Amino acid sequence: MSQAVIFKPFVSVPSSNHSQRKLQNNIINVGVKIQNRFRVVCMGMLAPRKFLQKRRKMEVFKDAADETDQKRWRGLMLEIESTGSAVPVLRQYKTDGDQGLPRDLVLGTLVRFKQLKKWNLVSEILEWLRYQNWWNFSEIDFLMLITAYGKLGNFNGAERVLSVLSKMGSTPNVISYTALMESYGRGGKCNNAEAIFRRMQSSGPEPSAITYQIILKTFVEGDKFKEAEEVFETLLDEKKSPLKPDQKMYHMMIYMYKKAGNYEKARKVFSSMVGKGVPQSTVTYNSLMSFETSYKEVSKIYDQMQRSDIQPDVVSYALLIKAYGRARREEEALSVFEEMLDAGVRPTHKAYNILLDAFAISGMVEQAKTVFKSMRRDRIFPDLWSYTTMLSAYVNASDMEGAEKFFKRIKVDGFEPNIVTYGTLIKGYAKANDVEKMMEVYEKMRLSGIKANQTILTTIMDASGRCKNFGSALGWYKEMESCGVPPDQKAKNVLLSLASTQDELEEAKELTGIRNETATIIARVYGSDDDEEGVEDISSESSDDEDEGDDDDDDARETVLYDKPQEGSLGYGSLQTEELVGL
């Protein structure tokens, strides 16, 4: 039976879901919008958008007195934010002039910092107001103070405020108990938080929807998944439940199953929302997309969200861009970013860094440069992660001269390289077999007070073994233990792969503790890979039919060469609970 020969096109085609969605939009909106991929070529990559340009806002005031008050308040807010402390600034404003410190100004400041979730400033102002004769500190103020301590995880402060309320003859209510419970949860005392919750269930006050949201969040972050599941199941039982679970509770359960690695249950909870009459939102879909590793699956969820007439936000776009970037589908990643800009969604640091990473992974330096410059143009100034990702673009392009120049620029621009920055440069010199330069960077890192991690030491061991001899690799293997970084399985695999004789293999077996046939197989497989670039070419190829989310591959060489995202290399990769769930 003859076999069909399939030729893969030189330019990769967007995923079926994304391209079909774009085509459907084009049919509906004839002449309004053409497919993003082709428009990128016509307009130029990341062309400026009007909505990103700085515009001067016209302000309207009631009268001259209102203008004075507004500007005074803004000045006060800016001064508090710049100093990081509110009380000294408020004291100064109180003593300046005859006007003193108006009550409305203080109240507005409190409300604004509460909206900004700057609970440290809220608690500082309220603690100060407790002892001011001109301010009538009421029960509402106490409740706001205990809420602030709850958000900060300051259970000592929350307990103290609750004690004061009790002495005043005030009966603790659902707000104060919930705040105390949250303070325990955020303070790492999950059992104490659970005890408060159980007491509320048994003897009152009756837990509110917010109470249930917070206890679910506490259980999930404390890895008490069984307890969270039991609470949620109780809420689903109409006979036992005092209230129905709301959208945020469903979001938290989706996040919990993601965290537990139970994707099937997460999808089941997602699907059950419609039947229970709970509306799905952008956050719901973001929660579901966040744990998918295949760009095809992420794209399907994204398409489903749009079919449901739910508008994606910057997190939605960032998750889809990240999925395409990981799959080395840079054109699709760029297309989605352009779509985001066309939709008038303002990109964040995270979104730009994810797009930058999509090009950096494949060593596309010029495209990465364009993204890097676009950040500044759009008044989103690159941070250290942006610089480190740009550095990795040079490294992945094997342009070590460019990498060295850019590394110097990082310091010139006022940033101090961290362990990931140094590790990226070390990786580059290791790939280039330039051991001397690699060691220079390593020594600079040590002198700057940064301790090497497992990945860096494994990289140096691998390069030393390949470029020098097996004895040098042995020395670095032993160095790991002396540095307090015990060799992991990947380091052991690399050492075994560097053994070129039977004696060296036996010595490696003795050190690693691997004495079975696996050690011999590893040595044969990795020992035959003399051409490193060949290894990289193989690891970077992917079939259209393959699942792109194979991040758990235990290939030692791949780890050493940083082909997979390292922990901390892009801190924006995994989105945190509060951003997804909104608690």
Curated annotation (Swiss-Prot):
Disulfide bonds: none
Biased composition (Basic and acidic residues): 557-566
Keyword Transport tagged: no
One Pfam family, short name: PPR_2
PROSITE patterns, A to Z: PPR
UniProt feature, compositional bias: Acidic residues: 528-556
UniProt entry tagged with the keyword Repeat: yes
Similarity comment: Belongs to the PPR family. P subfamily.
Protein name per UniProt: Pentatricopeptide repeat-containing protein At3g59040
Natural source organism: Arabidopsis thaliana (Mouse-ear cress)
Source organism phylogeny: Eukaryota, Viridiplantae, Streptophyta, Embryophyta, Tracheophyta
